[in-house]
């Protein structure tokens, strides 16, 4: 295999969450947001994974939708995941782990954004 030039518009990047702490909201996450904005502005694609990790950051993510159809799809996805959690008696807004809390995360919003 040899490296070859390509277009950013031909690439798709999957973004996976790592361990959240009190600094990730001012370091890694903003950098990945700017990276995503750059990739998308140049015709590429970024994909966030782990929808439950987005609970608490819905409004911020929805504000980045390119059009109303995308916004509606995102709202539906969030609502469907929340209904799944409710149907299986799983807590939605109690996600921070002991490790997150030790790192300075106190709420789901802190974890989702940081």
Where are these regions (language model features)?
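Anaerobic metallocofactor- and corrinoid-dependent redox/one-carbon enzyme cores
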Residues: 10, 15, 21-114
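Active-site cavity-forming subdomains of large catalytic enzyme subunits
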Residues: 1-3
């Amino acid at each position: 295999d040899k490296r070859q030039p390509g277009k950013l518009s031909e690439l798709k990047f999957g973004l996976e969450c790592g361990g959240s702490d009190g600094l990730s909201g001012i370091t890694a996450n903003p950098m990945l947001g700017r990276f995503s904005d750059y990739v998308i502005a140049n015709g590429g694609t970024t994909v966030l994974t782990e929808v439950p990790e987005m609970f608490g950051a819905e409004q911020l993510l929805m504000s980045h939708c390119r059009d109303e159809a995308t916004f509606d799809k995102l709202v539906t996805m969030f609502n469907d995941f929340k209904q799944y959690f409710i149907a299986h008696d799983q807590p939605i807004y109690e996600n921070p782990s002991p490790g997150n809390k030790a790192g300075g995360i106190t709420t789901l919003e802190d974890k989702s954004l940081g």
